[in-house]
Amino acid sequence: MAGIGFELKKLFRRKGLFASLRAYGYAGIICTGPMLLGVLLQLGILLLCSWSGAPRDQQDLLVCMITYTLLFSLTVTSFFSMPVTRYLADMLYEEQEQTILPSFWGSSSMMLVLGCTLYGLFLLVSGATLLQGLLCLWLFAEMIVNWNAMSYLTAIKDYRGILCSFLAAIALAFGLGFVLVVLLGCPVLEGMLFAVTMGYGLMMVWDVVLLYRYFPQSEESPWAFLRWVDAFLPLAFTGLCTNIGLFAHLVICWAGPSGVQVKGLFYGAPYYDVPALIAFLTILVTSVNFVVSVEVNFYPKYRNYYSLFNDGGVVGDIVTAEEEMLAVLNRELRFTALKQLFVTAAVLSLENTLLALLPLGFNDLMHGYFRTLCVGYGLYAVGNTILMILLYFTDYGGAVAAAAVFAVSASGLTALSMALDPAFYGFGFLIGAALFYLVTLFRLDAFTANLPYRVLGQQPIVAETKAGRFTRLGLFLKHKKRKPTKSAKHSAS
């Protein structure tokens, strides 16, 4: 990601409003692509449905289906995302580009089999019609491939291609939805769901074409990445727990007193969901700042510090490099927190004016949720930035512990808040995000207080190779692929 930051930094140096907008567009899409695309499509769908005069129950069911599909796909990919990214980084560092495409299809296949099986079972009993269920499953499969492809696309630094695929997906979804629903009078639910599916499908094809343009095809095993899942299992659970903490409060509200049964197993809480989606956009500034400022300024000091250990630097130089690195880190984290505080305060001050421009029907309760969740998402954004720094220092244990605290506290406190007045529903997530921020902050402070010991004393004397269930699964799949069939044996004889 630091390499991405350096490339984006070049764009920010260019003069002019258009250059700045393009740089922020690249950074925003790269950092928060999946959720940003989902939020924009949700808001656009609501606007199109209101223009077409669609019944409220159809709008609610459409939003529920897309939201369920989005959150389920992000949950499945969250477990594999960090280990796959680590595998990708290692292979690029070792100049093993021939392993990239096989690992992409291997990881995508693994997530598709697991995710489509579970989500397909849910759709069978959800109350959706056959056509609606097939469209949801189709959309889910496209999202899995798209979210996985984002990790690989950032490696090739083709930000224009990423931006174009992103914009093309939105344009096709909105344009096709307008034609089908508004002009041709197709059923709102099926027409809009098909349009969104086509939009994500275009993005998927575009991204895969980009990958094939940059990485060579080969006969390498597509399951080699599974060894990295075993070796970096804390990374997998860090991603999963962070995802649970980020989205569990939505699901709990659906099942709570404010939840509404839209159809079958599809529940929603419109008064809570819409403010949550819009409040999520306020963390964009911190996500962008982390890549283009924190990492760009911190990484050279970080690299210099660790190179002194690898290249036999003297103690005095190591101590000086450590002081410089931590000074830059503290400064950048402080600036990040201040920027997020400024954005949150500005949004809270202008929210009545800004939200009045959108035909979303905000009432006093929704305004309260929006303010509460803006603060919660702001704390999460800063805490997540510190979590990334813990991963820089390979404090995987501290990172997974902080993510687990976030998942348990945000989920548990939101569940407890269901017994309170509806005005307090967002406070469970806010307190969970605050705990997440405090745990990551204290853990980073404790970890860096004795950094030389962490670098040298906690490393294993002998290199360890972890061969767990995922490694054995990879070997099994690799062996099964190479095993000749009976017909092949007969023809050979």
Language model features with spans:
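Alpha-helical transmembrane segments of multi-pass membrane proteins
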Residues: 67-72, 108-113, 121, 125-153, ...
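Small-residue-rich midsections of specific transmembrane alpha-helices
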Residues: 63-89, 243, 247, 276-301
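Alpha-helical transmembrane segments of multi-pass membrane transporters/permeases
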Residues: 153-179, 390-412
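N-terminal membrane topogenesis motif
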Residues: 1-41, 60, 64, 226-235, ...
